[in-house]
């Protein structure tokens, strides 16, 4: 694990921002930090970045308790972007890169590579105030990753981007992971979570209410519901399948086939169900309906009210 938090608690006046939150982030993974507004995600991120300190609990980074020098091994892109509007893009990028410990030569060399990669060489001498929100975010993304930190923390990194640039940044995040970086990814966009995250933690009301691998969580929260596209007679299916093990939820006639939704009493009945279907009709397609992370997010948060 590159990052672990143990029972982190943080109180602000009459508001308990974090209540014993523990997470474990594997190396070279994309880790989703999820939760409604005000759940405590940003407070946890600020503690990891040593912007604020916990009232109790510990943070461990790369095998040791988090210390001041670890700031150079962490890159943080906050949701609230901030660039000096009157400075030129190149000048400011150099300044921020030097703050992260890069020499002038290394900073300029790396920035030129990234500016060329993103096709933004012409921005170097522009003032920041001339950039759109999306353009400024590209600059901040670059200066966040430039010093090749072990851990990257992105808070709503796709905010303000058009679909093409969202895809660009997603691909770069996955490239960084493949190169060995670890990414903590905080967002409300559940489709992006499913696309790029390996593990997640869901925080609600200052507590960790769900953690684990994405695929495992989605399977565990399935309701044993299956869809079958078929050609044949619906009554043949109803007569064939065991009513004590399955129930037909719906059947809809399509242009070229029919679609039936069936609920099984347990997931172990999946193979038996498929064999019974094949013996009674022509099966075109058969799949289990796995809940989306959006569905699970809503279900867990509403259940925690």
PLM region spans:
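Short, charged/small-residue-rich alpha-helical element at the C-terminal edge
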Residues: 225-303
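Short, Lys/Arg-enriched, disordered terminal segments
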Residues: 1-3, 302-305
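ABC transporter nucleotide-binding domains
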Residues: 3-5, 10-204, 210
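Short, flexible helix/strand-to-coil boundary loops that buttress conserved ligand/catalytic motifs
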Residues: 70, 221, 301
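Generic structural signal for individual residues within well-ordered alpha-helical segments
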Residues: 93, 108, 115, 167, ...
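ABC transporter nucleotide-binding domain
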Residues: 171-261
């Amino acid at each position: 694990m590159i990052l672990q938090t143990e029972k982190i608690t943080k109180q602000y006046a009459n508001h308990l921002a974090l209540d014993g939150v523990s997470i474990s982030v594997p190396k070279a993974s994309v880790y989703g930090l999820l939760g409604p507004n005000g759940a405590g995600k940003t407070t946890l991120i600020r503690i990891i970045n040593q912007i604020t300190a916990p009232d109790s609990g510990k943070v461990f980074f790369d095998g040791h308790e988090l210390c001041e020098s670890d700031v150079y091994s962490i890159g943080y892109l906050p949701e609230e972007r901030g660039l000096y509007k009157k400075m030129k893009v190149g000048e400011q990028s150099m300044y921020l890169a030097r703050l992260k410990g890069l020499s002038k030569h290394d900073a300029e060399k790396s920035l030129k590579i990234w500016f060329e990669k993103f096709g933004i060489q012409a921005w170097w001498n522009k003032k920041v105030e001339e950039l759109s929100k999306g353009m400024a975010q590209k600059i901040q993304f670059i200066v966040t990753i430039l010093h090749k930190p072990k851990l990257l923390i992105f808070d709503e990194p796709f905010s303000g981007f058009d679909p093409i640039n969202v895809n660009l940044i997603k691909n770069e995040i996955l490239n960084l992971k493949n190169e060995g970086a670890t990414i903590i990814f905080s967002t409300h966009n559940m489709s992006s979570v499913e696309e790029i995250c390996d593990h997640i933690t869901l925080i609600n009301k200052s507590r960790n209410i769900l953690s684990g691998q994405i695929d495992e969580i989605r399977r565990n929260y399935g309701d044993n519901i299956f869809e079958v596209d078929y050609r044949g007679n619906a009554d043949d299916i109803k007569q064939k399948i065991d009513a004590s093990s399955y129930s037909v939820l719906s059947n809809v006639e399509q242009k070229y086939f029919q679609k039936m939704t069936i609920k099984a009493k347990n997931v172990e009945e999946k193979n038996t169900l498929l064999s019974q279907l094949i013996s009674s009709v022509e099966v075109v397609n058969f799949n289990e309906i796995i809940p989306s992370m959006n569905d699970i997010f809503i279900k867990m948060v509403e259940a925690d009210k």
